[in-house]
């Protein structure tokens, strides 16, 4: 099984708000999905994957099974995890103030590459801290 990157991002076209696109030029087909929520877009993406596998089976073409590593842009991440992580909490984790995070969510401001890297690094550090905790 091969693991490929999949980009989850916000789009502002028509009724769909989120897009999920496979970022794997080495794979002989492309995949994408769209939806009003990240979950809908992921489900649409996985449906497309099932459909392409069915087509390849019908045409007797071989393919490698894929697993997916989802990568989020900051607005999509903030929206997807908003029910778990508050902006106040994310400010403490990332050092980016709530107002700026809110601008990212609303699309009124776009983070610089250095901000994205810092946000990702701080978030992963927080996740590592959580993984090292044992509750007794």
Where are these regions (language model features)?
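Short, basic, alpha-helical segments at the C-terminal edge of helix-turn-helix-like DNA-binding modules
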Residues: 118-123
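DNA-contacting interfaces and partner/effector-binding or oligomerization modules
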Residues: 1-58
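Short, charged, surface-exposed hinge/linker loops at domain edges
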Residues: 1-5, 47-116, 129-135
């Amino acid at each position: 099984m091969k693991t490929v990157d999949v980009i989850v991002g916000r789009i502002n076209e028509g009724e769909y708000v989120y897009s999920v696109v496979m970022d794997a030029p080495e794979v002989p087909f492309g995949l994408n999905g769209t939806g009003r929520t990240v979950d809908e877009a992921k489900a649409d993406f996985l449906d497309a994957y099932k459909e392409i596998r069915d087509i390849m089976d019908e045409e007797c073409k071989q393919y490698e099974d894929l697993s997916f590593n989802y990568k989020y842009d900051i607005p999509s991440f903030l929206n997807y995890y908003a029910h778990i992580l508050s902006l106040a909490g994310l400010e403490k984790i990332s050092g980016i103030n709530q107002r700026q995070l809110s601008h990212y969510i609303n699309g009124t401001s776009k983070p610089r590459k250095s901000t994205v890297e810092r946000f990702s690094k701080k978030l992963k550090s927080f996740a590592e801290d959580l993984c090292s905790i044992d509750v007794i």
